[in-house]
Structures are given as C-alpha cells and as structure tokens.
Amino acid sequence: MKSAVVQLPGLNRDRDMIAALTKISGQPPVTIWQTETEIPDVDLIVIPGGFSYGDYLRCGAIAARMPVMQAIIDKASKGVKVLGVCNGFQILVEAGLLPGALMRNSSLKFVCREIKLEVVNAETDFTRAYAQGQVIRCPVAHHDGNYFADDATLAAIEGNGQVVFRYAEGTNPNGSINDIAAVMNEKGNVLGMMPHPENLIEAAHGGSDGRGLFASALDVIAA
C-alpha cells in the first residue's frame, strides 16, 4: 500500500501516523507539505491530528484553504482513499469533503483518555477487519470533537450507512450527537474520525484495537 501523510504547521501526530503506516504496510509513507499542489500516485492519503495553524478561526478552517487541500479533493474525487484523524477530521469537514460540523466539547474541556467504539458499519474499506457491532478500545485527545449535523443531514448519514463508529458503553467524551465518532462520505472513500487508531496498534501501546482500520484498507487495496 502506497500512502501519504499530510504535514501542516501545528499538526503533531504526523510521526505517530507515519510509524503506524510503516509498521502495518511495510512501506514508509511519503510526506506532503501544505504548499504542494500535486500528490504522488498513492492508495491512501492521511491527514493526522494536532492543532493546525493553532486552531485559529476554527479548528481546521485555515488548513482547509491551503493549496494541498485542492489536490486532496481532486484525488478523493477519483476514488483515492482519504483518512482524517482528529484535526484531520476537522479539516475534512471544513473542506466540504465530509458532512456536519465539529464543535467545542460539551464539557468545554480538553479530553484525553481511552474510550470505547462500536463498529456501526463493518462493510467499509476501513472496517472490514472488524465485526459488525464489535466494541473496540481507542484513545482520544481533543478539545473540539463534538460532532453535530442538522436533522436532514443526520437522517441522511444515518440512512446511508455513513456513520462508521459510535462512542460505546457511555464513553462519549464530547457530547457528539447520536454518539457519532466517525463518518464517511457517500462514496465511501473518505473517512473522518476523532479517536486515534494509530496510537493503539501493538502490544507496546497496551493493545492493538486500532490496527484493524489500517489492515482493512491494506487488504482492500491489495485485493
């Protein structure tokens, strides 16, 4: 699997993501800087977490307007898989690649802890390694992860199977509507999620529940 990791000022989870992709796919990803307007031929583009541009204006608002984003939008339109984690999710929403909005946590506090996720849709290219309804562990670390969508949008994404993960067993850390933790686009090649699967992929992390997300994409691409 050929992958690419986007690097922007303020993102600080790029090294974690690079390490995860390298360990699982066996190939180190290429890195893409904010000013680049062309992206190499890759199977997966990842926008990692952090605080791009200091979260000024809104989380992800400035990053979504950088030159590299148009290149990502173009690749997504051609079916290339795109994953946004934490701030990456916020950027994808701001760029219009995913529906809804991400607001300040209902507690008005930064939350950093382990939560539980239910696999709501196990038929996506990112979740095939999991079972439908499976509950997995995953860490979160964010201040603005409260997912919201208006009634029409919510009905559409629920009806279309675009909700991929929900916070489970009462562990919703941010007040997200319907406990939504991850959504994808209608086409199914763009996924955004607040939890950090890259930080739970091996025994040294205390578990490997996040590994299935990357393994799923790898298996689909290799098929």
From Swiss-Prot:
Gene3D superfamilies: 3.40.50.880
Annotated compartments: Cytoplasm
Keyword match ATP-binding: yes
Pathway(s): Purine metabolism; IMP biosynthesis via de novo pathway; 5-amino-1-(5-phospho-D-ribosyl)imidazole from N(2)-formyl-N(1)-(5-phospho-D-ribosyl)glycinamide: step 1/2
Keywords for this protein: ATP-binding, Cytoplasm, Glutamine amidotransferase, Hydrolase, Ligase, Nucleotide-binding, Purine biosynthesis
Catalysed reactions, semicolon-separated: N(2)-formyl-N(1)-(5-phospho-beta-D-ribosyl)glycinamide + L-glutamine + ATP + H2O = 2-formamido-N(1)-(5-O-phospho-beta-D-ribosyl)acetamidine + L-glutamate + ADP + phosphate + H(+); L-glutamine + H2O = L-glutamate + NH4(+)
One Gene Ontology CC term in the entry: cytoplasm
One Gene Ontology MF term: glutaminase activity
Keyword ATP-binding found: yes
Active site: 86, 196, 198
Biological processes per GO annotation: 'de novo' IMP biosynthetic process
Pfam families, A to Z: GATase_5
Primary localization: cytoplasm
EC nos: 6.3.5.3, 3.5.1.2
Subunit organization: Part of the FGAM synthase complex composed of 1 PurL, 1 PurQ and 2 PurS subunits.
Task performed by this protein: Part of the phosphoribosylformylglycinamidine synthase complex involved in the purines biosynthetic pathway. Catalyzes the ATP-dependent conversion of formylglycinamide ribonucleotide (FGAR) and glutamine to yield formylglycinamidine ribonucleotide (FGAM) and glutamate. The FGAM synthase complex is composed of three subunits. PurQ produces an ammonia molecule by converting glutamine to glutamate. PurL transfers the ammonia molecule to FGAR to form FGAM in an ATP-dependent manner.
Descriptive protein name: Phosphoribosylformylglycinamidine synthase subunit PurQ
Annotated organism of origin: Rhizobium johnstonii (strain DSM 114642 / LMG 32736 / 3841) (Rhizobium leguminosarum bv. viciae)
Lineage: Bacteria, Pseudomonadati, Pseudomonadota, Alphaproteobacteria, Hyphomicrobiales
Gene assigned in the entry: purQ
